[in-house]
Structures are given as C-alpha cells and as structure tokens.
C-alpha cells in the first residue's frame, strides 16, 4: 500500500479577507460542481522542496471545498532517487547518458507504485502526478479505468532538455489527459502536447512560513542562531544545489561587503531525502565560505523549520534568489509577501513574480551586488519596493488562485 500523507485541516473561509471577492465566489461555484469528486495526488516525498509544500495547503483546501482528496507517496529508495536526480538535472539541460541500468531502476519503482495503486481497488476521478519521478505510473497501472482522468504536473523548466531523457519519458507523458506547466516557456521543444495547461504555483499566506510575525518575534528567533540582528543581512533560501548557485551568492556578499562592511549573509536550505546531491553541495558551500564568521549556513536539519524561515525572511534587509535555472522560485513570492526587497535572477518563473518597482531582476554577480548595496543604502526605496511586491503577490500568487485553476481543470476533464 502506498504511504498516505495527512496534511491536516484548512478552511477556505479563512482566506476570504485576503483574496478578491470574485475569486472567492468562483471557488464556491466550482466546488459545487465538483463536490464528491475523488482526487489522488502522487509525488516522491512528503517533505523538502516546493511540491510537498504546495500539497500541504492544496489538499486540505480542496477537501474543505467538498472534494475527496488523498495524497500518496510513491515507492522509492536511494538508487531510485539517485536516478531521478540525474533525470531532473538532465531535463533542465545537464549532460547525462541514459543507461539501461538507470532505466531499469526507474521503471522498477514506478511499476511497484502502479501495482500498489491498482491493487488497492480504489476508484479515482482524477490522478494528479507530480514531476518526473512517478511519470510512468499511469502506463504501468493501465490507467485504472475509463472514468479516470490523469494529469502530469511539471514543476521544473524543461525548455532545453537532454534529448535522451525527454525522448524516453515523453511517450508516457503524452498519454496523460493534461500536461500542466508553470508557463509556456518551460515546455520542451518538438513534442506534441494536446493537453497543455498553464498553471503557476502559489504560496499559502496563512501557513507557519508565511503568516505575519512581529519584528520582535522575528528578531528573537533569528538571534538564537547567532546572527546579529543589529546589523544588516542578506538572505537566500533554497536547496543546496548548483542550479540555485549558493557559491555565486557568496560572491555577491563579498562584493557588497567591500561597500557595507557590517553586512552578513545567511543561507538557508531544505535538505530533502530525494536529493542525495544536496549533501555534497552543502559541504562544497561550507568550504567556499572559508570560515567567514559573517556567513551562516542553516537547514531543516539544524532546527530551521517553517517558523524560522519566516523569521529570517521577515527580518532580512535584502532577499536574494540567484538561481541559474528555476522551476518557479516560490521563495521569491514568500519574501515579497513579507514586503521584503528582492534581488533575483531573470530566469524561470521569477520575472512573473517581480514587476516594475516590486523587486530587482539581475543577470550577473556584479549587478546583484550593486542592487543589494543600493537597497542597503536607501531604506525608503527598499520599503516601497517591498510594499509593491507584496500587493503583486496578493493579486496573483496566493493558494486560493492555484486551487481555482486546478478546479477549473478538473471540471474541464470531467465534463461537469
């Protein structure tokens, strides 16, 4: 039997004062049409990374709307996650030679997951599969029946994919009733996608990571980790991964420190069990920091959880997101929701989140350093930028909008 995740309870009514009236009304109308629909989400992990974080909000909100929603974790072990990490990087453009051995490992765990799903005897109206790890579950389960509609959700940028991996996976993905991408620019070239649907992700404004914290509370929490709250600090929150470029962030910090000598740098990362390369890059980042006492590295394994991330984001003088490649970069919306000035790379979904005056988009390390130095030297400019960024997120990147988009797709596929 597949492991089920209990995401707790959330009430859609709690968001009514935060979102637009029209959006709340449409959610009520869609909920009425889809009441009782059975939906199963399948992904690779229940912690670490943006997919799990989204599902911890999306699943209980859909339940509150009247749908019968479950969340299951596919079978996996270290050999499988090593393979899928290589697939993940390859789909984002990394060099990789697809081997018979890697295919066999990948197919074994997808087949085991599909078998458990089929043997459960449960019937589903919608099966919602997230990212490459479980992409073959539909094929190996036989589709579960004529009434089941299958959705494959890609949370990464596959616009310049390794063709071997894409050509291997795509015939299976093409069989899904819908392929959901964050934006058209992420889709792979040269493939047919009759079910293409564009749905950007979103953040939960009421989650522990995003709820309002007083400055005193945030300062107390941050100070417990040794960061001097009386001095400015730059922050990046991301996995320790070459695509997030923590080494480049350290280079930015070192350039800023030449102008603002008291500045500190905090790097916070979530270590997920399906990301074995993360540990290697953690140690690489530690070594690159070179023992600088003003550089701090933390993770969920050093007691930095959602509240602590909230505190760091709420208190940071500048939030950086120096991704080289990015699926969407929800941490940008998280920081903007806290009215923080953000300096971020012009990649992936980040430009969707940063509008004119609501953040600074950069392409190089010197540009990032200059932007950070400007924000540190002009607090009023930084405050106004943070205010504009927050309102853009309120209008476009909160979870009720994501739920609305998913429900629209369900209704279309089920013909209700």
From Swiss-Prot:
Keyword Magnesium: yes
Domain of life: Bacteria
Listed InterPro entries: Glyco_trans_1, Trehalose_Metab_GTase, TreT_GT1
Reported regulation of activity: Inhibited by 20 mM Fe(3+) and Mn(2+). Partially inhibited by Zn(2+) and Ni(2+). Activity is slightly enhanced by 2 mM Fe (3+), Mn (2+), Ca(2+) or Li(+) and by 20 mM Mg(2+), Ca(2+) or Li(+).
Glycosyltransferase as UniProt keyword: yes
EC number: 2.4.1.245
Catalytic reactions on record: an NDP-alpha-D-glucose + D-glucose = alpha,alpha-trehalose + a ribonucleoside 5'-diphosphate + H(+)
Sorted UniProt keywords: Carbohydrate metabolism, Glucose metabolism, Glycosyltransferase, Magnesium, Transferase
Subunit details: Homodimer.
Role: Synthesizes trehalose from ADP-glucose and glucose. The reaction is reversible, the equilibrium strongly favors trehalose synthesis.
Family: Belongs to the glycosyltransferase group 1 family. Glycosyltransferase 4 subfamily.
UniProt name for this protein: Trehalose synthase
């Amino acid at each position: 039997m597949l492991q089920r995740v209990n995401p707790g309870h959330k009430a859609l009514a709690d968001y009514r004062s935060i979102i637009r009236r029209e959006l709340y009304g449409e959610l009520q109308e869609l909920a009425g049409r889809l009441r009782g629909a059975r939906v199963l989400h399948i992904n690779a992990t229940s912690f670490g990374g943006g997919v799990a974080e989204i599902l911890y909000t999306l699943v209980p909100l859909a339940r509150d709307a009247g749908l019968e929603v479950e969340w299951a974790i596919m079978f996996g072990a270290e050999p499988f996650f090593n393979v899928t990490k290589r697939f993940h990087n390859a789909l984002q453009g990394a060099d990789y030679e697809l081997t018979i051995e890697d295919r066999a490992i990948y197919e074994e765990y997808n087949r085991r997951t599909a078998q458990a799903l089929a043997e459960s005897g449960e019937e589903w109206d919608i099966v919602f599969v997230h990212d490459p790890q479980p992409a073959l579950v539909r094929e190996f389960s036989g589709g579960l029946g004529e009434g089941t509609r299958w959705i494959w959700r890609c949370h990464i940028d596959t616009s310049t994919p390794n063709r071997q991996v894409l050509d291997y996976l795509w015939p299976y993905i093409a069989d899904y009733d819908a392929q959901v991408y964050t934006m058209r620019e992420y889709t792979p070239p040269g493939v047919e996608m009759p079910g293409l649907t564009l749905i950007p992700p979103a953040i939960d404004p009421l989650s522990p990571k995003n709820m309002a914290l007083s400055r005193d509370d945030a300062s107390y929490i941050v100070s417990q980790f040794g960061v001097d709250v009386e001095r400015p600090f730059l922050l990046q929150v991301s996995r320790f991964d070459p695509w997030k470029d923590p080494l480049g962030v350290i280079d930015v910090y070192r350039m800023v420190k030449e102008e603002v000598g008291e500045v500190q740098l905090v790097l916070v990362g979530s270590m997920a069990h399906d990301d074995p390369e993360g540990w290697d890059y953690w140690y690489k980042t530690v070594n690159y920091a070179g023992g600088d006492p003003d550089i701090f590295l933390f993770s969920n394994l050093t007691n930095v959880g959602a509240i602590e991330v909230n505190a760091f984001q709420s208190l940071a003088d500048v939030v950086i997101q120096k991704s080289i490649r990015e699926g969407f970069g929800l941490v940008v919306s998280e920081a903007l929701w806290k009215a923080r000035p953000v300096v971020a790379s012009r990649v992936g979904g980040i430009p969707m989140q940063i509008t004119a005056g609501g953040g600074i988009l950069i392409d190089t390390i010197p540009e990032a350093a200059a932007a950070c130095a400007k924000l540190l030297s002009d607090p009023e400019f930084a405050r106004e930028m943070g205010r504009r960024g927050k309102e853009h997120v309120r209008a476009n990147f909160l979870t009720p909008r994501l739920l609305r988009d998913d429900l629209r797709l369900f209704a279309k596929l089920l013909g209700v």
